[in-house]
Amino acid sequence: MMNQMGMHMQQPGVVPGGPGGPVGMAGGPVGGVGVSPVMMQSPQMQQQQQVAAQQQQQQQQQQQAQAHQQQSQQTEKVDNISKVKGLVGPLRDSLSTTVKTAAQLLQQNNLNDAGTKGGDMSTTTPRFDKHLEEFYSICDQIELNLKTAKLCMQQGASSQQYLPIPVAPTQPNPAETNALSYSQYLDVVKIQIGYAKDIHDTLICAAQNICPSE
């Protein structure tokens, strides 16, 4: 009996543990298999990794959206009206330079006619014709862009009048089911051109029949 009681007595500083064996005072398993704290934290680590991956995907999507917006803005700036707006500044500078050059040449010619020296002869005479040609070149570019914009507006109005069905771009939106594709639009234009040619030929034949040539 004394031996059995001694076997059941607890050792000092040791408390009985579970299936893994006795547990010490610090709470760690003694002589048994415990659960690693890394394994206990693995679900939290997985959640953090998933959140980080989602944030990276969102950042990539935002960057792609910003790049798409920049490309669309660059393509929008290519139209004729934007070109005209961009040429207004160079036109103003060219006009100012041309007027200043003309004033310098007039002053120099006045001094030459009066028989006085026009300052330092080593300085080069400003080229009035060059500045004037540059000014007219910018004016021609503005005029050409304005004419092109006017023709585009006229063609757009004619298209809305004679072909009210909207034309889809090269990459059509799936939601726009009542839109023509670009290839269908080209076919319609070819048919209209053929009709116009037939009417033209018919009118010419009728005019020749009314007034036959001798």
Curated annotation (Swiss-Prot):
<feature type="compositionally biased region" description="Gly residues">
    <location>
        <begin position="15"/>
        <end position="34"/>
    </location>
</feature>
<dbReference type="Pfam" id="PF11568">
    <property type="entry name" value="Med29"/>
</dbReference>
<feature type="compositionally biased region" description="Low complexity">
    <location>
        <begin position="44"/>
        <end position="74"/>
    </location>
</feature>
<dbReference type="GO" id="GO:0003712">
    <property type="term" value="F:transcription coregulator activity"/>
</dbReference>
<comment type="similarity">
    <text>Belongs to the Mediator complex subunit 29 family.</text>
</comment>
<keyword id="KW-0010">Activator</keyword>
<protein>
    <recommendedName>
        <fullName>Mediator of RNA polymerase II transcription subunit 29</fullName>
    </recommendedName>
</protein>
<keyword id="KW-0805">Transcription regulation</keyword>
<comment type="function">
    <text>Component of the Mediator complex, a coactivator involved in the regulated transcription of nearly all RNA polymerase II-dependent genes. Mediator functions as a bridge to convey information from gene-specific regulatory proteins to the basal RNA polymerase II transcription machinery. Mediator is recruited to promoters by direct interactions with regulatory proteins and serves as a scaffold for the assembly of a functional preinitiation complex with RNA polymerase II and the general transcription factors.</text>
</comment>
<comment type="subunit">
    <text>Component of the Mediator complex.</text>
</comment>
<keyword id="KW-0539">Nucleus</keyword>
<feature type="region of interest" description="Disordered">
    <location>
        <begin position="1"/>
        <end position="78"/>
    </location>
</feature>
<dbReference type="GO" id="GO:0016592">
    <property type="term" value="C:mediator complex"/>
</dbReference>
<dbReference type="InterPro" id="IPR021018">
    <property type="entry name" value="Mediator_Med29_met"/>
</dbReference>
<dbReference type="GO" id="GO:0006357">
    <property type="term" value="P:regulation of transcription by RNA polymerase II"/>
</dbReference>
<keyword id="KW-0804">Transcription</keyword>
